[in-house]
Structures are given as structure tokens and as C-alpha cells.
From Swiss-Prot:
This is Zinc finger protein 11. Keywords: Developmental protein, Growth regulation, Metal-binding, Nucleus, Transcription, Transcription regulation, Zinc, Zinc-finger. InterPro entries: Plant_dev_regulator, Znf_C2H2_sf, Znf_C2H2_type. GO terms for cellular component: nucleus. The gene is ZFP11. Residues 117-128 have a biased composition (Polar residues).
């Protein structure tokens, strides 16, 4: 009994010594890590900063701050947009022109049939940019045609004025030439008459005698 008791005590002492050695070893390892950490040999453990909006992780607080500023700007822009754009559109029921039409058939018409008609009405009332550009092109082409017509009219008027002026000058020249011819004919007739009177001196004497007789 004494031997077994002594053996148990010896075993306990050995286990305590081993545990003490293990504890001292762990303490030594911790002290070595702490010394290396103070000396700067062990870096800081990496820390991730998560965004509260999109749960994106960043390695530095500065990067997270810049990312949060972007989210704040987006929220400020959304606040400036009017709220009625985000509300669902409530379509008013279209009045039935036929009074004999039953209410059951009108209730069976769904919004799926109403929406295409509304889109068609909007497409009719509000022209698209392509239609606007077509209108601009048509107006510009019409304006160009009108300008060309005005130019052609002015050219025709100028031609007619020139033609009338040329005709007037030609008629004046013709009248002048006719007057010259008539004057020449009168001069020739007078010359002939004078010549005839000079050629017949008897007639002249006869006139003088008659005057004396009277």
C-alpha cells in the first residue's frame, strides 16, 4: 500500500512538472510574439471595412469614406427628382360611346388592352424627334423651293423689262427713220416743184402779166 501511494505521488509530481513546463513554454511563446510585435516584425492584422449600403469591403477607412460619399450624392440626386414619377399610373376609365353596351363586357376589358391604346394616343399627340427632324427638313426644303421660285420670277420680270425696253427703242428708231424719210420726200418734192417752176419761165411771166392786168 505504501509503495502504491508513493508511486501515485511521484506520478502526480511528474504531471505537475510537465504541466508547469508546458505552461512556461506557452508563456514564453506569447512573450516572444509580443516582443516581435513591439519591434515591428509582426504586421497589424488586416481589417476590412464594409459599406452599410452595398456590403462592399474596403481595406482602408479612407477608401470606405470616398465610397460612402458616392452613395450620399446618389441619394441627394434621388431626392431632387419629384416623387410622382415613382408612383404607379392610375388610368381613368374610358367612357363608352355606345349606351346599349353592357357593363359586364366593359368590366372584362383589362388594363393590358387599355395600355396599347394609350400609347397610341401618346404617339399621335406627341411627335417623336425623328418626325420633328422630318418637319424641319420639309420646311427647309419648302423654303428653298419658294426662294427658287422668287428668283425665277425676278429673272423673268427682268427679262420682260429688258425686252420691252428694247422694243420701245426699236419702235422709236423706226419712227425717227420714217420721219427722216418723210422729210426727205418733202424736200425732194419741193425741189422738184422749184425746178419745174424755174424750167418754165413763161408761167412766171404769165403770172406777172396777170397781176399787172388786174
Amino acid at each position: 500500500m505504501k509503495r502504491t501511494h508513493l508511486a501515485s505521488f511521484s506520478n502526480r509530481d511528474k504531471t505537475q512538472e510537465e504541466e508547469g513546463e508546458d505552461g512556461n513554454g506557452d508563456n514564453r511563446v506569447i512573450m516572444n510574439h509580443y516582443k516581435n510585435y513591439e519591434a515591428g516584425l509582426i504586421p497589424w492584422p488586416p481589417k476590412n471595412y464594409t459599406c452599410s449600403f452595398c456590403r462592399r469591403e474596403f481595406r482602408s477607412a479612407q477608401a470606405l469614406g470616398g465610397h460612402m460619399n458616392v452613395h450620399r450624392r446618389d441619394r441627394a440626386k434621388l431626392r431632387q427628382i419629384p416623387s410622382w414619377l415613382f408612383e404607379p399610373h392610375h388610368h381613368t376609365p374610358i367612357a363608352n360611346p355606345n349606351p346599349n353596351f353592357s357593363s359586364s363586357s366593359s368590366s372584362s376589358t383589362t388594363t393590358a388592352h387599355l395600355e396599347p391604346s394609350l400609347t397610341n394616343q401618346r404617339s399621335k399627340t406627341t411627335p417623336f424627334p425623328s418626325a420633328r427632324f422630318d418637319l424641319l427638313d420639309s420646311t427647309t426644303s419648302y423654303g428653298g423651293l419658294m426662294m427658287d421660285r422668287e428668283k425665277n420670277k425676278s429673272n423673268v420680270c427682268s427679262r420682260e423689262i429688258k425686252k420691252s425696253a428694247i422694243d420701245a427703242c426699236h419702235s422709236v428708231r423706226c419712227e425717227i427713220s420714217r420721219g427722216d424719210l418723210m422729210n426727205k420726200k418733202d424736200d425732194q418734192v419741193m425741189g422738184l416743184e422749184l425746178g419745174m417752176s424755174l424750167r418754165n419761165p413763161n408761167q412766171v411771166l404769165d403770172l406777172e402779166l396777170r397781176l399787172g392786168y388786174l
